[in-house]
Amino acid sequence: FNPTFPNHKNGDGSWDGVTNASQITNPLAWMEVKDKESVSRISTHAKLLLNFTPDLKMRLFGSYSYNMVENSQYLPTVVWAHGQAYRGVRKSESLVGNAMLTYRKRLKRHFIDALALAEVQEEKFSGFYTTVTNFSSDLFGFDNLQAGALRPWEGTNSYYERTRLLSFMGSANY
């Protein structure tokens, strides 16, 4: 970048530099970028022990996690030719349930040891984002995406994925 440009704005509020090209702006103009990120997280766990008899026991475990990340960014017209706004949300959820049943019995010279396990798991991922360019003013930023005139190719997308797993296991010893 041209080192002879001043380290402050001009009298009209603009930065010296090539303002009609993207990503060739005065590096100090990048301080005017509006960037916001919001993160929400919830994580819970529970465990329950049941003793039906001294020989028969059950353990139950469950957990739930939720994550959401919201991103918003506005590159003003002094940074990106005609400005650019981006908004996106990513969410994930995870649910796990686990059950374990044990039986241990001694009868004189005999010993029985049995185990039964079951687990269920589900995960969900979803999100969307959109990018808008060609703003006539920096007045709205990322708060009004309609103010931008163009949506670039592949500038908007959404997705959803859901996976599940169910498993069982058992063992017996004599």
Q: What are these model-predicted stretches?
A:
Residues 50-54, 105-108:
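Outer-membrane beta-barrel strand-turn architecture
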Residues 46-50, 99-103, 170-174:
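Residues on the lipid-exposed face of transmembrane beta-strands in outer-membrane beta-barrel proteins
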Residues 1-41, 59-167:
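Surface-exposed loop/interface segments of Gram-negative outer-membrane beta-barrel transport/assembly proteins
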